[in-house]
Amino acid sequence: MGDTLKRRIQHFVKGQMCQTERSVVQEAPLRLTVNGRELATLVASPHQLNFLVAGFLRNQGFVDTMDDILCLGTCQEFGVANVRLAREIPAQLVPTLTSGCGTGISFNLADTELRPLQQQDVCYPATAVFAMMQDLNRRTEQYRSHGGIHSAAVGDNSGLLLYAEDLGRHNTFDRIAGEALFRDLDLAGKMLVTSGRVSTEMVAKAVRLGIVLIASRTSPTNMSIEMCEAAGISLIGYQRGDSFELYSHPERIVAAPDPGKIHGVTGVILAGGGSLRMQSDKSLLPLQGARFIDHVHGVLDELFEE
């Protein structure tokens, strides 16, 4: 995405100092002005700033649809963003300093933390959660090359829908919310996977967008667990490999069947016909005047041509 720069550095290893080149993450401030009023300065990776700004305003509750945004302009070179909204923002805003990288800001944390979700009946198989995290890991090229970049994605049982990278984990979700706004995508009932820690500001943003499941490679905070429990969100932490820890609303996760037990004819074929319980080879049992395995082969011959 062009968010890195090459720098000459000194590398100390095994008692020796040598010069080398290293990729470093770009960090850029963005001064946000809304309706002529300077609202905040966002510190973020310098790409797709329109998504970041729109998502930030959406997650703060200032906009709901693109119709609420009359004009939005950003300038990466000068680090400014100017927005004209159809409605005025509140005159008195009480900012909350969040636990995000570089200390994020939220204006609506208390307003969203206990608002229940509408789509409570949405369920996800564990395999879909694993597949989403694997897709996220494959896309996170910057993190593998030099670290310092967070990533997040939103999707459903059909797969990944939106993906974002940023040096701030809270910014990744703002970017996703903004892109969904531009593309008119409804995120209600979707799941969010993230590389970063799940804290209260992340949950508050998820509640506002109708996200029903959040999964992270790392740990959640105690307040985020309580917020997810109250809002009806399934919260997953420490998702690594083929395991995860589920902190709230386990009823939404459908466990995968035991891959070691396949029942019926398919199980007999794949198991080689052996039966520990019967102490015999089931494929050799008589069926319609022939062996069971011969009958299976005959059926398969009728179904599939050479």
Region annotations inferred by a language model:
Residues 137, 148-186, 256-257:
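N-terminal-biased segments
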Residues 1-157, 162-163:
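Intrinsically disordered, low-complexity regions enriched in acidic/Ser/Thr/Pro/Gln residues
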Residues 152, 192, 265-267:
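Conserved hydrophobic helix-helix packing surfaces used for dimerization/oligomerization
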Residues 22-25, 74-75, 142-147, 153-155, ...:
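Solvent-exposed alpha-helices and their adjacent loops that cap or buttress functional pockets
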Residues 155, 247-249, 286-287:
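Short beta-strand-to-turn element immediately C-terminal to the catalytic PLP-Schiff-base lysine
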Residues 248-260:
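A charged, well-structured terminal subsegment
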Residues 170-246, 255:
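Feature captures the catalytic cores and cofactor-binding loops of soluble hydro-lyases/lyases
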Residues 261-306:
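Nucleotide and nucleotide-moiety/phosphate-recognizing core
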